[in-house]
Amino acid sequence: MTHHLTDNYLANLSIATSLLSLCQLVQPEWLNEFIRLGTTPLNSSSGETSLEAHFDFLSISKFRPTFSPSLPESQKHFNKWEPNEERVNLFRKFRFICMTEKIREMDGELRDAIHRGGGTLENFDIHSDISKFHQALTRSRAKEGKSVVVIGDIDAIQTAVGSAAWEALLAEAKRLVPFFNLS
């Protein structure tokens, strides 16, 4: 994938995955223009150059998305949204444990972002007992010398297993992994 079509620069998983993949973010009109030029005849009477005669990607600056009003000012700079080699393998030093109710419920966009960023991923079923969670954390810490990141939807976990079980999982995670609450 080379380009991601979006009307707005947004802080979401889909765009994060594209940034990890060094994609250009462009408005959908970019693709429309690209297709139009691709179908322009070789000897166009309008004087336009057909992509078939002279292939060149369209200028990105003409098709930049607009900044979402929800973005903080610090993120409203075009250079923050351009491909950046420093993002390649951003997660390579991390092993993610995703806490989900059912292993198959793992968010596909989240999985894709982790893999595109070079991270490794393990799922943990929150209905398993605390000893299995301890084993998963210990095993993950020992593998590949990577830092462990435990992620999950707090509200969904509490709803699924109850507050007491959630508190036990949280205590075990805090005991074995440095804790940062990003919610």
Please place each PLM-identified region on the residue numbering.
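BRCT (BRCA1 C-terminal) domain core and associated BRCT-interaction motifs
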Residues: 1-64, 102-183
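Short coil/turn segments at beta-strand junctions that form active-site/ligand-binding loops
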Residues: 92-94, 145-146
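Conserved short N-terminal element of RNA/RNP-binding modules in eukaryotic RBPs
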Residues: 94-102
